[in-house]
Design a protein with these regions (language model features):
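A short, charged, amphipathic alpha-helix used as a generic interaction element across diverse proteins
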Residues: 20-48
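Short, mixed-charge low-complexity intrinsically disordered segments
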Residues: 37-67
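Short aromatic-glycine-(Arg/Gly/Cys) micro-motifs in beta-strand/loop hairpins
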Residues: 1-25
Length: 67
């Protein structure tokens, strides 16, 4: 599972980590990285900060540049 923590660009600053509720909260969990990037492109974002869940307990945060 991939969770988008932040979406940046075109005035968007959305958080999906529970610290701030947004109307897009339901769209922050993706089955794969391709779906997350498609979401970013669809909304005209300049980047995503992703949290990848690896083997359940390990997490890795990856800030992305322009996608």
């Amino acid at each position: 599972m991939i969770r988008v923590l932040r979406v940046m660009g075109k005035g968007l600053y959305l958080r999906g980590d529970g610290s701030r509720t947004t109307k897009f909260a339901e769209a922050f969990n993706f089955p794969d990285i391709g779906a997350a990037i498609d979401f970013c492109r669809h909304h005209g974002c300049q980047g995503l900060e992703l949290m990848l869940f690896v083997q359940g307990a390990q997490t890795l945060t990856i800030p992305m540049g322009d996608v």
